[in-house]
Amino acid sequence: DVKIVKKDKDNYEVVLNNRVLFEITTKYISTETKLGMFSYEKREITSIEPNLKRGLIFYNVTIPSTYKLYVNNKLVEEPTTKEKYKNLDNMYQNDSMPYMATYEINGLTKEESIKVVNEYDEEVKLKQNKYSYTLEKNYINVDSYDEAKKYLSSEVDIWDFAHKWSLFLTNDLSGLAHGYNTIKTYFIEGTSMSKQAYNWAHGIDINFTSRHKLKDPTFTNEKLNNFTIYSKDAFSCEIYLEKNMIVNGKDQLDVMHDYIYFIKDNGVWKVVNIKAGE
């Protein structure tokens, strides 16, 4: 349906199915009274600006780059723009992490069907705002590893990394260079995580960790949940564990509560970021 929508006292829009076709500018001439009761403004149109660069019917669809967009059951091949997910720059070391892709569909003569399929060949529900379509979430959330591994390209031993990282931070990890040669296999060379681990192992502070012993069992109260899956080859999870130590003859807990970010690199899971838990 075509509607005329007032923007402000001088400007109007001609709208078809939530799309602006024309912008109309007017100017005030006079106020007139009808039947001695009703007053109205008399206005003159000063300009009519068409807004038809994209045609009568058009859409914007924003989805992860690993998803497929179909318009009228035809696959749309290339997005108009691609942007990184916000606050996840460390995930972009290769092609494992998807981008947010926006498709501008222009020049249609009638409303067409819009369908989006994720990388697991499941149709996903879209949220419409005028002529723009987005997803409620641009990732999959599950609470357990058993659920998460259904969406991942292969299994990953998260606890193996978490235990070794915890030991590395208290100078308890076996291997050359205070365990650096052991832990570095989990990182992509040249990334911030790789540099952070190298600097810790080769700096002076690691030599001043408190003298302590590890209890048996070393790790207790372990929790692994809150998985966010960005693609088959990129995800994050929340981890909690308590490392049991004896310091100066007294029991002491070293708590690890972090979000760990993984991507696949050359077929191997790597850690690209660790953020402190809340």
Predicted segments with their positions:
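Core segments of small alpha/beta cavity-forming domains
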Residues: D1, T66, S144-T218
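Exposed beta-sheet edge and beta->alpha loop/turn motif
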Residues: V2-P79, K84-K86, Y92-M100, E104-T109, ...
